[in-house]
Structures are given as C-alpha cells and as structure tokens.
C-alpha cells in the first residue's frame, strides 16, 4: 500500500509541477489500486477546503480510497514513541500528527510518499518506508 501525505497531495492539487506533484499524478495513473488513505491525512486534506465545492470534491477523493484504520490502543502510543525517539536522537519532528501517520504506515506496511521533512526524520529513526519528493 501507498499513503500519499498531505504535503504531496497539496502539490498535486495546486498543479505546481513539482516532483511531488508529478509523482502523485504518476501514482494515480499507474498504481491507483495501491493508494490508500488514513483519517489523519483525510483530516488535513479536508481542513484545507476553502469552499463547499472544493470540500465535496475532496470528500469524494478521500472516501474513494481504501482506508488504513487507526487502532487507538496501538497507534497513538506508537506515535508518542516515535516523537520521543526523535527527541532522544536530537531530531526535531514538528508535527505529532506526522508521527501518527508514520505509526499507521509502519503498522500497515505502507510506504509514505511525501514532501515533508518530518518523514525524513522519522524514516531515519524507525523502519518507516518513505519516498521523499522535496
């Protein structure tokens, strides 16, 4: 499975032409069946909708992908552990939400496609499979 982080989705939605946007477009055309969503990413994507039409379009996208479910008893604690491990290693993770997304990806064996330095840090200190397009 492939999780596309909000950082890469935003590049795609804005049609920036960045390497992240190009990779998301490639994944959607060549590996669509492998793309999954998770609620933390859905929350970030949907919170960026400025109008109802955009929100409706984004809801269709989010709801049209298989979802990697959050297991509260496992994933939130794993996210806290990732955050603490980064701090112990002298690394900075700016978003605890990225730790939660990483915990989900690790548990589900999914690869994260991103444009976010947090996932580079997390991949260095865990077994997160991450493809950076920064």
From Swiss-Prot:
Organism: Mycobacterium tuberculosis (strain ATCC 25618 / H37Rv)
Residues the entry annotates as binding Mg(2+): 5, 98
Lineage, broadest ranks: Bacteria, Bacillati, Actinomycetota, Actinomycetes, Mycobacteriales
Pfam families: PIN (PF01850)
HAMAP family documented for this protein: VapC_Nob1
EC number(s) recorded for this UniProt protein: 3.1.-.-
Keyword Metal-binding: yes
Stated induction or repression of this protein's expression: Induced during infection of mouse macrophages.
BP GO terms, sorted: negative regulation of translation; response to host; symbiont-mediated perturbation of host process
Ranges for domain PINc: 2-126
GO molecular function annotation: magnesium ion binding; RNA nuclease activity
SUPFAM superfamilies xrefs: PIN domain-like
Protein name as annotated: Ribonuclease VapC11
InterPro entries xref list: PIN-like_dom_sf, PIN_dom, PINc/VapC_TA_RNase, VapC_family
Annotated function: Toxic component of a type II toxin-antitoxin (TA) system. Acts as an RNase. Upon expression in E.coli and M.smegmatis inhibits translation, cell growth and colony formation. Its toxic effects on cell growth and colony formation are neutralized by coexpression with cognate antitoxin VapB11; the effect on translation has not been tested but is probably also neutralized.
Protein family (similarity comment): Belongs to the PINc/VapC protein family.
Presence of keyword Magnesium: yes
Cofactor(s), names only, from the UniProt record: Mg(2+)
Record key words, sorted: Hydrolase, Magnesium, Metal-binding, Nuclease, Toxin-antitoxin system
């Amino acid at each position: 499975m492939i999780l596309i982080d909000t950082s890469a989705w935003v590049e795609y939605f804005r049609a920036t032409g960045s390497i992240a946007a190009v990779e998301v477009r490639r994944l959607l055309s060549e590996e669509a069946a492998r793309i999954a969503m998770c609620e933390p990413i859905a929350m970030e994507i949907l919170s960026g909708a400025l109008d109802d039409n955009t929100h409706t379009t984004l809801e269709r996208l989010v709801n049209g992908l298989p979802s990697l479910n959050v297991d509260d008893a496992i994933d939130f604690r794993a996210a806290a552990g990732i955050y603490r491990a980064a701090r112990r290693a002298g690394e900075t993770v700016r978003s605890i939400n990225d730790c939660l997304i990483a915990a989900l990806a690790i548990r589900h064996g999914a690869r994260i496609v991103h444009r976010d330095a947090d996932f580079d840090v997390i991949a260095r200190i865990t077994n997160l499979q991450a493809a950076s397009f920064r």
